[in-house]
Curated annotation (Swiss-Prot):
This is Ornithine carbamoyltransferase. L-ornithine binds at N169, D233, S237, M238. The keyword Zinc-finger does not apply. Belongs to the aspartate/ornithine carbamoyltransferase superfamily. OTCase family. GO terms for cellular component: cytoplasm.
Amino acid sequence: MAFNLRNRNFLKLLDFSTKEIQFLLELSAELKKAKYAGTEQKKLQGKNIALIFEKSSTRTRCAFEVAAFDQGAQVSYIGPSGSQIGHKESMKDTARVLGRMYDGIEYRGFGQSIVEELGTYASVPVWNGLTDEFHPTQILADFLTMKEHGRGKQLHNMTFAYLGDARNNMGNSLMVGAAKMGMDIRLVAPKAFWPEEALVATCQEIAQQTGAKITLTENVEEGVKGCDFLYTDVWVSMGESAEAWDERVALMTPYQINMDVIKQTGNPHVKFMHCLPAFHNDETTVGKEVAEKYGMKGLEVTEEVFESEYSIVFDEAENRMHTIKAVMVATLGS
C-alpha cells in the first residue's frame, strides 16, 4: 500500500482516510524493522525541522529529535520560553517566518486552532505534537502497539476501553482513531467527562462507513467486558489548576485501572496501555504530594497493573518514535 502524502500537514486524524492511516502504520512498522536491522535509509537528508514546544515534553520531543536524526535531518528546539511566539509575534507571522527557514514544523501547545493556523500559513508540512483537543501522533503509536500485541487480530477486529477523562485530547483522539479504523471503543467515564456531542456525532457518522462501534458508558464492568486493551491517561491534564485535583480524584477513583478491572475484562490476554507519564506510585514529586493528600499511591492506574505482565506502556512509548518518523518521512521525505 502506498499513498502520496508529500507536503501534507498532520494536524488531526479527521483529516486522513482509513487507508492513509493504515499506510502510515505500515510505514512505521517498516521503518522500525529497518532501524533494528541497521538497514535504515535516510529520507530526510539535508532537511531542517523546527520543534515548537509551548508545553514541556519528554516522549514527544525525544521521539521527534531521534526520528529526525535517524533520517538525516537537523532540528531546532524552540521551548516555552525561547521565542517571541504569542508574546511579540502572532502565530500567523511566526508561521510565515519559520516556513521560509525550515522544511517542516512540529507544534506542541494549546488550542487546536493554533496548530491549524500554523498549518495554513507555514507553506511547509506542520505536525501536531499535542494540542488541548487532539494528540494524533500518540494514536499512531497506540495503534502500532495494538497491532504488535493483538495476537494476530486486525485493528477492525479489536475492542478496547478508555477509562477516565474521556473529554481530553486522548479521549477525543482515540475515539476518532477507532472510528476511522473500524474498531470497537468504549469510553468509560463520568458523563460530565464524555467528549463533546458534536465530535461524538462526527465519529458516529464515520463509524457507519467503517463498521466501528462507539460506546459511552459510566459503567466500568459493562465497558471493559471482553476488551483486548484497557487504556487510561492522567486525570488532570497539563495547564489545569491545582484545584482540579480534588474534584477529579473524587469523580475518577471508580475508573482507576486496577487488577479487579483487569479481571472484569474476562480476557487473560488483555493488555494495559497509557500514553505516559503515569501516576502509578509515589516516586515522583507530584505522586508524593497526591499520596500524602489523598492516601493513594496510584491514581489512574495501580503500581500492580503498571508493572505487571499486562502492561505494554514502554513498547507503546518506543513506538512514538517510529510512528513520528513515518509521519515525517511520508510528508517530507525524498
